Amino acid sequence: MFRLFSSGVDDLVLVSNPSNGEVTSQIGARFDRELIYTNIGEVLIAVNPYKALPITGPEFIKLYQNASGSDASPHIYALAERAYRRMVDENESQCVIISGESGAGKTVSAKLILQYVTSVSPNNSSGGGIGGSGGGNGGIPQYDGGSDDRPSPPMGRGMGMPGMVGRGGLPTRGGGPPSRGGGPPPTRGRGGPPPPIPQNRGAPPPVSNGGAPPPVARGPVAPPPTRGAPPTRGGGPANRGGRGGGPPPVSTSRGGGGYGGSSKTVDVEHIKKVILDSNPLMEAIGNAKTVRNDNSSRFGKYLEIQFDDNNAPVGGLISTFLLEKTRVTFQQKNERNFHIFYQMLGGLDQTTKSEWGLTQATDFYYLAQSKCTTVEDVDDGKDFHEVKAAMETVGISRDEQTEIFRILAAILHVGNIRFQGEAPASVIDETPLQWAASLLGCDPTFLCQSLNHRQIQSGSARHTQYQVPQNPDQSAGLRDALAKTLYERIFDFIVARVNKAMSFSGNCKVIGVLDIYGFEVFERNSFEQFCINYVNERLQQIFIDLTVRGEQREYHEEGMKWKDISFFDNKIVVDLIDGNKPPGIMRVLDDVCKTVHAVDSAAADIKFMEKLIHSIQSHPHLVISNTGSSADEFTIKHYAGEVSYSIEEFCFKNNDNLYASIVGCLQNSTYQFIVSLFPENIQDNKQAPTTSSFKIRQSSSYLVTRLSACTPHYIRCIKPNDKKQPMNFVSSRVEHQVKYLGILENIKVKRSGYAYRQLKDIFLNRFGKIMDVQPRNVQEFVEYITRTHKDINADEFEEGKTKIFVKNPETIFVMEDLLMQKIDPIGYKNRVQAYKENEKLAQMKQGKHSMKQKCLIQ
């Protein structure tokens, strides 16, 4: 109705002779006009512009809020509007699945979805309907594709266009070069050793550097902590450190309390603020600079916004998975550790830094090893204060903030501990050990012994505990395990606090937004890329199942005339990785880890490769070029292309052990906050250890279950070039993504199929209101609508066994307008008027940016 301007084909379903090349050309033609969004029916294609575009903001939110599906050109706000309205109209949960490779712009797309939904939803839960006064979110930032170089600030500030790019190099057990023992650069003066630590509560008596620490005896041994149980609407009681106790490796714990209760007691504006302000906090602890992106997400996040019966956001839940813990101890050249370390060094006051022995990033091995400690145009100190403000918003007290930053400071000192000699290894320089012990509230001798001895429990009935001295390499491995464990517990604590601040226990609908690592392939790929790409295979499987296979299956089940369209089914790749019969790669890996977990890591990796060659070498999507004794990599033919994986440390990383000596040391800390982060008891050689691959299979299945319970909406993000160059469209690079994302197959199904389908009763209950008398059946409605409205043809409708199908979306748009005119004529008139006014404002805003481009809204 209001399609005023046209620039190219805004819906690829309209392409006459679709091919991968033609689709790429159409996307490129729009991109050249700074139109970064294109539709495939209801699937949105989003191309990263790597520059700021004035296509977001309050004017555009109002414009899309008041527009029906026929009113607006492709835009992420249009998709967000559709998801929100469907939740309202159909009373069903929705989800937005954002996919694409690293650097394609998934994270900023997720932010824009959240901004739109919090803006258009009511500000209170006691009254409402749809489209309240907005979320009090201040100014909405412009779409910036080229400068996503710091954690996203709260609303009203600038934002960037991140991707999710990983590192190529990976850590060794000793922490990488310059030696297997790990090794920071020579430290500059830090003003002497740290102050004495507080009186240790119950610490063991001091022993010499070379001796064995006393065994940790704290009662029955509990299984290691997992990353939390699947969420429940009720939130559940608080737990120590906010770590859930269920098996799935997804961090979702709410920590209890918060804003739980009925919707009548919920401060909706506070919930909106938590949802938006948690972004810079989550990015600070979960994002990092990589070689291809200055703000790369190094974890997966699924955020569910919970809505009450009045469609107001009354709660939320963040589920996290696949945190890249190895980044704490190793980054490849020109990458950085997680943002929070640099922010802390840049933002803490000098007194606190002196008390904690903090100087500059180049003095700490965990930050200096990559030769990159700063990012252009990023003020880490300024970002630190924004992060602290976000912590206050989510209910992390100032005392708790101090505890968190003290632990982060301790991690930096832990990284500077180096070892030498024979087993048990001795510490080269006591200063970083003293600082780490002081900040962790541990006896320095006990901490040292926890690193140069590993506690083992015998498999006999007596379960005798004994100490195994560690050489420098092994001690460095324990040192890095300590650092990664501390960081993971802090990460989970913060996630739990964010969830506590959004906790809601009433009945609700949700809109979920998935932001996860993109597909990764580098010169050197290891266990991390293997896991990331497996999850992306699962997400691609969901997309294919719901948009291609599922749609064709539905036509057959409904008795429709349909000729199947061929497509690549990546189930064969998923089964290669996680299959049970025959066993997939993960099952083979777990089996090796169970049988040889006490053996040297390198020997375990060799055994893993031998079993791969023996059991699944013949698989059509697995390539093992070298099958001899020196075989050290395998290649998987993924849906997105071939990736070769180095087997080095596959078994070590898959075991992901939590060592008893380390836990025992931290459980004896004088700081109760640290003790609360480690409530469990642990033994090293559990009979059936929980492996990383097992956790990943569980978390991906959990995620698939959550997504499958919602009506899905898809955003397919595309990276136009590999150098982050603004408005540079490399056709060959884009066409490769168009091909492996299955966009062409999706277009063909949409062109041959139906844009809308609904159960007959629901359809008649809604659109039957257009008639003066409720129709008795679909045929009666079709006869009426085609007789009274000449622009609607009878062949637009097809009746299946249980559902009614409509071929073109324009028909639905017309019927929606007719329905609004019938049930709310005044509101419809006001909506049209508001649309026209907002359209003028949007055109004026964009006109200032470019005289050549008339308007995004057509």
From Swiss-Prot:
GO terms for molecular function: actin filament binding; ATP binding; microfilament motor activity; profilin binding. Coiled coil: none annotated. Residues 183-228 have a biased composition (Pro residues). Transmembrane segments: none annotated. Pfam families: Myosin_head. Residues 7-820 form the Myosin motor domain. Residues 821-858 are annotated as: Tail. Keywords: Actin-binding, ATP-binding, Cytoplasm, Motor protein, Myosin, Nucleotide-binding. The head domain possess two actin-binding sites, a classic ATP-dependent one and a secondary salt-dependent one (located inside the GPR domain). This is Myosin-K heavy chain. It comes from Dictyostelium discoideum (Social amoeba).
